[in-house]
Design a protein with these regions (language model features):
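ATP-binding N-terminal substructure of ATP-dependent carboxylate-amine bond-forming enzymes
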Residues: 1-98, 293
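ATP-dependent carboxylate/phosphate-activation module, predominantly the ATP-grasp catalytic core
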Residues: 175-238, 250, 261-289, 296-298, ...
Length: 307
């Protein structure tokens, strides 16, 4: 099988590596001349995918290369690039392993929070109202991936210094700080046919956010079932077509969901493969055309992936 992977950053490294484990041939497309995933790909094409469909000779050459593969898998979170890819693939009849509707919700922390509230998902206490705000709190820009722009604020002065123009409900999420260990898990499939994968423990620090992943999890079976139920409920509400991950914290008061992302993650899929032999890239591809993923190992083994 031949796949096009668009984006050579962390997600691209993950996908190119897993593609090799699956025995796939990869075409990596990135606008940079030497992205991190470059040496993991079989073929590389430098291209700005927002220009697909244009008249440029080099762009048309890249289009021809992409059309020679079986499926396009995005490994980036640039809204303009994703929209351009979605439109171009639709026009060309090319399979695109992406759910734009689910991504539109999960790429916004405000829209995600609305979904959590509709689903009854346990989340950190909102802290937008000054009269009920208890520090420390977490400030998150609504748009953006992971921990980018997220700050732990200890008092009102720090909040005003970090958001000097005042709190804009359209641009920020303020919520109570929740201490405790962090966990992640993925779900993949189509409505009525989802599979939930191995829970992983996230190693966190102040400097690098997630600095490593451990599998299998050290959490209790009952806590794992609680995470799985929350993720399945969210996927069904979104009518997810593809792959989504969930990050939670186990607080003294119970589980608190931090975020969901309907895109291919980095770090955790490698840990899942090392522990179980299950390849999340294969399962993602199987959502879009007939493909039989490998069965994995009989029993999980210990894996610790640090970076």
């Amino acid at each position: 099988m031949r796949v096009t992977i668009v984006g050579g950053g962390l997600q691209g490294v993950e996908l190119c590596w897993l593609a090799r484990k699956a025995g796939w041939e990869t075409l990596l497309v990135d606008e940079r001349p030497a992205p991190p995933a470059l040496r993991l790909a079989d073929v590389f094409a430098q291209c700005d995918v927002t220009k697909l469909g244009g008249s440029g000779v080099l762009t048309r050459k890249v289009e021809h290369q992409i059309l020679g593969t079986d499926i396009v898998i995005p490994a980036l979170e640039n809204a303009a690039a994703l929209a351009a890819l979605d439109g171009w693939c639709a026009r060309e009849g090319m399979l695109f392993a992406f759910d734009p509707c689910a991504y539109e919700v999960t790429s916004s922390k405000l829209r995600s929070r609305d979904l959590f509230l509709r689903c009854g998902t346990p989340i950190p206490q909102p802290a937008a109202r000054a009269d009920t705000r208890v520090f420390p709190i977490i400030a998150k820009p609504s748009e953006g991936s992971g921990s980018r722009g997220v700050r732990l604020l200890s008092d009102e002065a720090e909040l005003r210094a970090y958001i000097p123009e005042g709190f804009d409900a359209e641009g920020w999420v303020l919520e109570s700080y929740c201490p405790g260990p962090s966990f992640s898990l993925e779900i993949c499939g189509t409505p009525g046919n989802y599979r939930i994968f191995q829970v992983t423990d996230l190693l966190m620090d102040e400097a690098f956010d997630c600095r490593g992943v451990v599998a299998p999890t050290g959490s209790s079976p009952s806590f794992v079932r609680e995470m799985e139920a929350a993720l399945l409920n969210l996927a069904e509400m979104l009518r997810l077509h593809g792959l989504m991950d969930l990050e939670v914290i186990q607080t003294p008061e119970g589980m608190r969901v931090l975020e969901i992302d309907a895109r291919f993650p980095s770090q955790t899929p490698t840990a899942v493969w090392l522990s179980t032999g299950v390849n999340l890239a294969e399962h993602l591809a199987a959502c879009f055309f007939p493909y039989a993923p490998g069965s994995g190992l009989g029993a999980p083994r210990f894996a610790r992936y640090e970076h």
